Amino acid sequence: PARSIPACSRQPGPGLVPARLRQPHRASPTRPGCDNVPMTALFAGLTTLDVLHRLDHVPDPGLKVTSTDFTMAAGGPATNAAVTYAALVAAARPRSADEAEADSPAPSPSGEAPTLLTALGEGPVSAFLAADLASAGVRVLDATAPTPPDHPSAPGERGAAPASSLREPAVSSIIEHPSGRMVASTNARLDADPGRVAAELPERVGVVLIDGHNPALAQAALTLGVPEVDGEDPFALLEARPPHLRVLDGGSWKDWLTPLLGLVDVAVVSEDFAPPLLARADGEQVAGFLRGFGITRVVRTRGERPVQYWWDGTSGEVPVREVPDASTMGAGDAFHGAFAWALERAGDADPEGLIRFATAVAGVSVSSFGTRQWLASPALAELVRG
């Protein structure tokens, strides 16, 4: 059965949750020690180096072109969602007069900063990613697995690829132009060992979000806060529940997701999310498939078309506001981060309110080029404060 986890008893004030999401009559906490726990979240998944170029015309593949804009930042679904969450934390925090005069809100240095469980790898690219995420207000737990001494890529092995090249994070090169975009990516190639950083995981969080890029990281995040269970009982882990909701960012189907779906409370999927045997699945079929694993809350994004939802027996659509000259890179990730932020603070009783807020934040994200410029927009504070 679906669980309804009330918002934390530390009553969110006007500067924390938009008026349209506030639920002043919700019961005070059932989470143990909730009064003393900062509102925060755990994100788990892929981190890449995103190199983005913008063109003012459709490129000719035979010609060298000059970009009109360029940026470089840490990317990846869970990573961009964590950055969005951190930006909303900063926008919600009361600011001094000096901060108000600054160009953008400072990243949150408090316990509210989201934690990102990921694999950064080694080398200068990894160092850049760590610095970029720190400046964005994201706390990073790097679970990159060590290279075994007998691995073919270990130093001294003849004919092996340089170990350094296999220890570097994935790189995505994105060219955005008026008719769309082109992407070339090395994809995920780092092994992760979350046990290396298990002691640094937050004791309690308000929400957990995983993307579909690393089963070890997903397993560690989804079992955070779960009581110890009888290892001989195959259903014990499914029945043991943490005191927070767990969200799946389902951009596309991955076969390894199947044994973990029973640990998910809310699935936010894209139109490309097509489970086995549902090659051209519609929303009803996807929601029905996930319902078979006990997931009774499903949100399905479809680009500029209305967002669909199926929520504890109800269903509907929420329209998406059209943004002219939209730069859609990372828009879905911004939606997921904003959805997690609102779910953690406002609870789960109003799915349409959660979706409206998340689509509004995603709308801000597409109003400027890249995945970082929009974080300085005053529109974020306006959305947060309702």
Predicted regions and their residues:
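Positively charged, low-complexity intrinsically disordered leader regions
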Residues: 34-60
